[in-house]
């Protein structure tokens, strides 16, 4: 998984208002998964982005590790943590590198949110990522994963999506556009170019863009791969007609550390 080098500088224009601050980001998941954690529970956000969720969780007194494959995202997470006055560990690591930095079976909760899993390279890369997350969880620990409904994304075909309103951050407006390149077969590499066009005070437009690789997956394939990684779905919001969904899966109590994908 790679990318989010350029976009790390403008990522707040891609975050919804409901998750824009650390407090708001943590609140989104509090009632469903975070509120039941014991004090000082250990939590990993393994695709932390600019750190709103990780910092929000740390503000609740949780022992948080924030990881991302993008150096820029990790730097921004550290800056947000410093600004909020909270302590967390931030590290640059792709999913398959996480077990090299973190001890197996030590986390109560792992987050993989923000549609991040679609950047894992194909079915093999996706399974490897899920296995890495699973092995870091304590038996009975939970993985929280959010995803686009890739069935709907593919059905819509290649297209340009321009947001229908200006997005305002830091007293500056931007137009955000998504350029989708959808391939014929599920297993092919798809592409998404995101453009954030910032409108300067003098009326000039400054665009920041990045082309990202995507490997979409069907919901039933995700559930099967979770099972292969030793994770059992506890709850899901998947609806064939909804744009996205949330899955909570727990690591099997009786299963040992998953073998890495080959």
Locate each region found by the language model.
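A short glycine-rich, Lys/Arg-flanked "PGG" loop and its adjoining helix->strand segment in the class I
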Residues: 127-139
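Conserved class I S-adenosyl-L-methionine
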Residues: 1-47
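Class I SAM-dependent methyltransferase SAM/SAH-binding core
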Residues: 52-98
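C-terminal lobe and adjacent flexible extensions of AdoMet/dcAdoMet transferase-like proteins
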Residues: 215-262
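A short SAM/SAH-binding and catalytic strip from SAM-dependent methyltransferases
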Residues: 108-124
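SAM-dependent methyltransferase
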Residues: 144-219
């Amino acid at each position: 998984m790679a990318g989010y080098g350029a976009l790390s500088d403008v990522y707040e224009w891609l975050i919804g208002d409901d998750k824009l601050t650390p407090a708001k980001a943590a609140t989104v998941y509090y009632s469903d998964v975070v509120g039941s954690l014991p004090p000082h529970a250990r939590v990993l956000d393994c695709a932390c982005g600019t750190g709103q969720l990780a910092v929000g969780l740390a503000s609740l007194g949780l022992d948080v590790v924030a990881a991302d494959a993008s150096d820029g995202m990790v730097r921004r997470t550290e800056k947000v943590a410093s600004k909020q006055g909270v302590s967390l560990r931030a590290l640059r690591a792709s999913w398959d590198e996480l077990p090299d930095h973190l001890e197996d079976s030590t986390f109560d909760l792992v987050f993989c949110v923000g549609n991040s899993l679609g950047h894992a390279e194909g079915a093999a890369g996706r399974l490897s990522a899920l296995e890495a997350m699973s092995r870091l969880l304590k038996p009975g620990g939970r993985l929280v994963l959010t995803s686009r409904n890739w069935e709907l994304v593919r059905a819509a075909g290649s297209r340009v999506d321009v947001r229908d309103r200006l997005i305002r951050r830091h007293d500056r407006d931007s137009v955000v556009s998504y350029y989708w390149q959808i391939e014929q077969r599920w297993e092919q590499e798809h592409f998404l170019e995101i453009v954030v066009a910032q409108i300067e005070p003098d009326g000039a437009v400054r665009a920041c863009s990045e082309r990202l690789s995507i490997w979409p997956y069907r919901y039933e394939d995700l559930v099967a791969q979770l099972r292969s990684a030793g994770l059992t779905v506890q709850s899901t919001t998947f609806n064939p007609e909804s744009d996205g969904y949330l899955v909570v899966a727990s690591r099997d109590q009786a299963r040992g550390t998953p073998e890495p994908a080959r």
